[in-house]
Every structure is written in structure tokens, then in C-alpha cells.
């Protein structure tokens, strides 16, 4: 496997869940072994939003969030951001309609389809749409 598309639903579990869900841990191990993670530009905003929500709910401390953001910058340095927001917005609308997804989730599906890479996600709707779109799920 040359790489995979990393959905924020998986990556957030690396910072929020202890113990980490089995699937999220398995995906993290792929990443730590040097398998390339591909993320859309939207991923960075989803990650920071998930962390600030966890801070507001007292799941993480401010220090935890600050450390997680530094870790995310390291992840992002190894990730390949191959799309622009404008291009994503155009395509995601059609994909969202076709597969009854949010526009945000459609961006991940489109990226996986375009790059011909498996998709790592914990989102049920996205997991259900992937095979119908011809996208392999990372197991």
C-alpha cells in the first residue's frame, strides 16, 4: 500500500480516546510505519475543531490541546494535501448529493477516489458510501 486517505474521525481518536479504539490504533500503526497519509485541506480545520470542542467539554486540558496541535503539525508535515478548497467545494456538492453525505465527508471520498487510495474512517455514512463509490476501506 502506497498510502491512504486519513479522515479526521480516525485521527481525532488518537488524541481523545483512552484506550484508543482498535481500528484507530491500527491506522495509527500504518502511519507510524511510514505509510503515507493523504488529507484534504479541510482536515486541519476538523482536527482543530474537534480538539477545541474536547477542551470546552473538559475532556482535554488546554495543555493537552496545545500538545495535540504540535503533534498534528508533525502529522500534517508527512501528509499530502492534494486538493484546493475551491476544487473540493465544486466536486463535493455532487458527491454529497449522490451518496447522501455531508459536503465535508464527500471531500474525503472524492480524495480517495481521485488518488485511488483506501479510506480510513470511523464515520458510518462514509464507510457505507465508500464501496458504492468504488473506494476501498482501509482495514
Where are these regions (language model features)?
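Acidic, PIN/NYN-like endoribonuclease modules and their adjacent C-terminal/linker elements
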Residues: 1-3, 85, 109-139
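Short, well-structured N-terminal submotif of metal-dependent ribonuclease cores
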Residues: 1-42, 54-67, 132-133
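Alpha-helix capping/helix-boundary segments
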Residues: 10, 43, 108, 125-126
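Phosphate- and divalent-cation-binding pockets in alpha/beta enzyme and binding domains
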Residues: 23, 46, 91, 128-129
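Acidic catalytic patch
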Residues: 42-44, 64-97
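Short glycine/serine- and small hydrophobic-enriched flexible loop segments
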Residues: 49-56, 113
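Aromatic "clamp/platform" in nucleotide-sugar-dependent glycosyltransferases that forms part
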Residues: 100
Amino acid at each position: 500500500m502506497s498510502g491512504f486517505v486519513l479522515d479526521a474521525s480516525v485521527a481525532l481518536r488518537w488524541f481523545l480516546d483512552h484506550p484508543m479504539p482498535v481500528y484507530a490504533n491500527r491506522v495509527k500503526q500504518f502511519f507510524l510505519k511510514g505509510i503515507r497519509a493523504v488529507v484534504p485541506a479541510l482536515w486541519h480545520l476538523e482536527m482543530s475543531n474537534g480538539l477545541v470542542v474536547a477542551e470546552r467539554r473538559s475532556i482535554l486540558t488546554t495543555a493537552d490541546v496545545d500538545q495535540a496541535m504540535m503533534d498534528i503539525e508533525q502529522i500534517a508535515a508527512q501528509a499530502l494535501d492534494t486538493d484546493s478548497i475551491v476544487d473540493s467545494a465544486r466536486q463535493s456538492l455532487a458527491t454529497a448529493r449522490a451518496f447522501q453525505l455531508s459536503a465535508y465527508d464527500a471531500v474525503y471520498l472524492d480524495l480517495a477516489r481521485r488518488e485511488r487510495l483506501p479510506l480510513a474512517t470511523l464515520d458510518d455514512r462514509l464507510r457505507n458510501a465508500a464501496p458504492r463509490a468504488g473506494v476501498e476501506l482501509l482495514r
